[in-house]
């Protein structure tokens, strides 16, 4: 009985893989539909927030699954080795589920279980990132861990490769690629070199080796990235020691983030992906204005006043400002929205 259900599940899995490979656009629309459903559910009934977050997490997992299928089938060779890719994937799964696990644990077992779940998730994420940093030398680690696939670029690449392979043939003995007469340009527009079947493959995909591989950070750069990885653990431990109303956890976390960014800014020859991630971390320093206790003491009254003025006096902005005012208290209570 179990073997029969397993075979059916495997057949369904294979059919879904074939669907994603043949219809990448349809897979993208499916992900967008699930994500839109999460927005429609929010606020509709008593447990809508938990269900909405579950649906939203499912959309992220679906996108991760579909990207993995397309990478495996359409990219040759795969961008990274198998074990490293698996670690990045598990890290992506944790980041996709962390908010739902937090609010689910709080709903089912109370506040202590919520903080236990937060600590376990942060420990798992830190362990995975430390292994990636010191064992696989991935350099500055981005968020999300697995870069979303440029599906349009992959499809264009596959079409171009198909056209290129059909417009020339390769000699059996010489292994030289020769254009067919029908696809040869006129003499004044022709390049007199052999056609390159795989030319520009990485550039068309929008990724180069320099973008995909981590840079050599050196001792200070590695230390800075380790500080960034361990900052959530340090913050949680200081919260447990000093309490949630104390300024010490907030100041310690801010100091660690600023130190990490300052040291990484001195590292040269960063890849494009790493430079984007570093700019993202600089921007996220603004989040400290929305993190307690700074938010409770300074930002909250000013921000709510600004939103109220925008909603009352700027036509059309009330549709955005008023729901945002209602959602801010909920957002403040969820750790991974603020500190994740």
Swiss-Prot record:
The chain crosses the membrane at residues 90-110, 115-136. GO terms for cellular component: peroxisomal membrane. It comes from the Eukaryota. Residues 71-86 are annotated as: Required for peroxisomal location. Keywords: Membrane, Peroxisome, Peroxisome biogenesis, Transmembrane, Transmembrane helix. Residues 111-114 are peroxisomal. Residues 196-215 are annotated as: Disordered. The keyword Membrane applies. Involved in peroxisome biogenesis. This is Peroxisomal membrane protein PEX16. It comes from Xenopus laevis.
